[in-house]
């Protein structure tokens, strides 16, 4: 395990981040710096390359246009509340999304392969800045670590120094 730096009785927060990333890499997650994820703007949170790669590899019987429709559904998902949006994506991750194959037959497309875990793309990402609007004001967040499965962020991790009494959640 990575050795944490102790400076005047305090540990350096980036060491916690590096230790977590190293641990996840040993468990098979692939590290990716958030700045290297291609996206149209900082409001985008998906890793489109991984999502497209997974869907294309897992669904050879789908036309590219149908795969793009699924990607667009995930990318443009929306609902009345943030909770409803998260619930919709969660349901898609568990149950899949309805699609139509090349024979014009209905099929269910999984966003995660629960049967063969090795078919999934696991990424641990840091240095990923996200822009959003809150009450009409543009804001940014840069979580310490994000976990992606097949291009979809499934976990946001904020690491805090337990010895720092002035630590905030942001």
Please identify what each model-predicted range represents.
Residues 1-170:
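An alpha-helical interface "stripe"
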């Amino acid at each position: 395990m990575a050795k944490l730096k102790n400076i005047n009785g305090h540990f350096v927060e980036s060491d916690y981040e590096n230790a977590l990333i190293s641990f996840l890499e040993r468990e098979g997650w692939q590290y990716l710096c958030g700045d290297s994820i291609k996206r149209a703007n900082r409001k985008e949170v998906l890793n489109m390359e991984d999502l497209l790669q997974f869907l294309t590899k897992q669904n050879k019987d789908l036309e590219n246009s149908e795969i793009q429709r699924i990607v667009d559904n995930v990318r443009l998902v929306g609902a009345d509340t943030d909770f409803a949006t998260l619930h919709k994506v969660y349901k898609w991750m568990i149950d899949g999304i309805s699609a139509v194959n090349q024979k014009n037959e209905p099929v269910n497309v999984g966003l995660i392969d629960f049967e063969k875990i090795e078919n999934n793309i696991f990424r641990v990402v840091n240095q990923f800045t996200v822009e959003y609007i809150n009450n009409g004001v543009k804001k940014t967040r840069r979580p310490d670590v994000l976990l992606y499965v097949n291009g979809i962020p499934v976990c946001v991790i904020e690491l805090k120094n337990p010895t720092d009494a002035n630590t905030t959640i942001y």
